[in-house]
Amino acid sequence: MKRTYHCFPTFLFLFFTLHSFSQTHTLSGTIKNRDSREFVSAVSIIIKGSTEGTFSDARGNFKLATGKPLPLTLVFSSIGFETQELEITGAADVEVELVPSSVLGEEIVVAATRTATRAMESPVTIERISAANIRNTPATSYYDMVTQLKGVDVTTSSLTFKTPSTRGFNYSGNTRLNQLVDGMDNQAPGLNFAVGNFTGLTELDVDNMELLPGASSALYGSGGVNGTLLINSKDPFKYQGLSFQIKTGMNHVDKSQRSKPGWYNDWSARWAKAFNNKFAFKVGFQLVQAKDWIANSTQDYDRLTRKVLPGSRQTDPNYDGINVYGDETNMRDNGLSMKSLAQLVQGQTRQGILDATGGMVDIVQTMNAALPAVPTQEQIGLFIGSLPEALQRPVTNMVPFYFGLRNNIIPEASASRTGYVESDMVNPNTLNFKLSGSLHYKITSDLEASLTGYFGTGNTVYTGSDRYSLRGAKIGQYKLELRSKSWFVRSYTTQENAGEAYNATITARRLNEAWKPSTQWFPEYVGAFVQARSMGADEAAAHAAARAFADQGRPAAGSDEFKQLFDKVRSTPIPAGGLFLDRSDLWMTEGQYNFKD
């Protein structure tokens, strides 16, 4: 027993000694700007001689748990401020005042050479937008800031679908400009170009954007002929805390497109948290709701010459309005004119009667001999009544075409179907919901693994060769990455689902065919035109009468019949309907090693 009592105090002494050596200190404090006395966020705090560290939050506060014994030295550094060292001898809160510095070209970018490079040392022009710029901008969204950069052109298809480009080359859906979000190609696989800011980062999670005007194919692939846009998210180790943002505004205040102004609402939130500078996560969402602008140009357009014409539906029978859909269907594109269509109808009827009578009856020659050039209705009725019953109906249908050709009153003109305006065919209510999140784990002080996901869905409008209404479209990007100081390996996938997206032009054309086929509509138009001309109407009045006659039965926009036909056609896949089917995906694995380091 005596021996046991001697060892027990020794064991206790060793236990408390070891415990004292492994004690954890929590160092905390506040960082301010010495001149303005404002809090400084995102300041890097590192224990000198080690890789342990943390970052200050939005209020300039920081906390750092360490097992290193006191005293120790903390190194404070941030872009725009002089680096400062502070010796810590106790666990009390400290207040650090950073001295602002203005050194041209000190900002670090990663765009020009895919490695960290100072702006003044970069061999190419770089346009950069920081988180502070985004926070202070009056623009509707951070993506709109890109349109204000030097040398940038932009095509706006809708509020959430904007296509930037550089060097004077631009069009809607630009396949010549790369857009990378955290290193992932942000293009929609089925479209081969980025869908603006429809999917990707929420506004509160954007750390910076970098634009390389001009060719960057050697660095970022063949899609970068006209430039590359890099959008980088915030590091959850560096930017922690809960953030919430609400933007509200109004548009259409001039009431030129709508009877009353519309609301623009943008809600977003972000939450990030780090644990012992080892594990961190972040989640975020953004919801945008607005009344989009309506494409309402009714100018006449010639698709062959690609020129705007000085005409309208009242003056041009072959009218094709820019934002009027369905009127693209016309006689000319089917290889016909009003006159050739009349000749076709007469020729088919004539040949049919010749075949039926064994070549005994040439109805055209018979009518030439039996009827005057301008007969009365009574004369026409008597002639048809004298024919065999089997011939009466086809001859009755041929009569207006025959007399139109005989009297040379049918022009070599084309006529188009009557279309519907965009507000009848496209839902102008914008909806965009984005959800993002990531998990980060530092395997060692120089090796980090991360799992990231971005998802976007909603309604928007895209203008290409036609006008597309993207309803319920969904795009998701998911990435697994292993990154060190001098190398990285990443694999990611992009999953695209077009949802109920449809082509407004094809939908309108198919809707017209559904209520009356063009094979019926065009002959009715020509026949009614001849009748109107025979009664003394001029060409303009005859065209108006012909359209009114051929459009009998046309469903009015907004009517129950229209809605039923519209829903049926837009949900039928192209080419039978207007539904744009797209279930594409992209898989990518890439790596990089910097031999310089």
For the regions a language model picked out, list residue spans one by one:
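Outer-membrane beta-barrel translocator/receptor signature
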Residues: 204-207, 218-230, 235-303, 431-433
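Extracytoplasmic beta-strand/coil segments of soluble accessory domains associated
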Residues: 63-65, 126, 143-188, 207-208
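Short acidic/polar hinge/loop motifs at secondary-structure boundaries
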Residues: 62-65, 185-213, 269
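Short, acidic, small-residue-rich periplasmic hinge/interaction motif at the N-terminus
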Residues: 30-36, 43-48, 73-81, 89-135
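N-terminal periplasmic accessory domains that precede
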Residues: 92-97, 142-145, 162-168, 177-182, ...
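Short, acidic Ser/Thr/Gly-rich low-complexity loop/linker segments typical of extracellular
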Residues: 51-61
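Short, surface-exposed beta-strand/beta-hairpin micro-motifs centered on an aromatic residue
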Residues: 59-66, 93-94
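Outer-membrane beta-barrel domain signature, strongest for Gram-negative TonB-dependent receptors
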Residues: 310-597
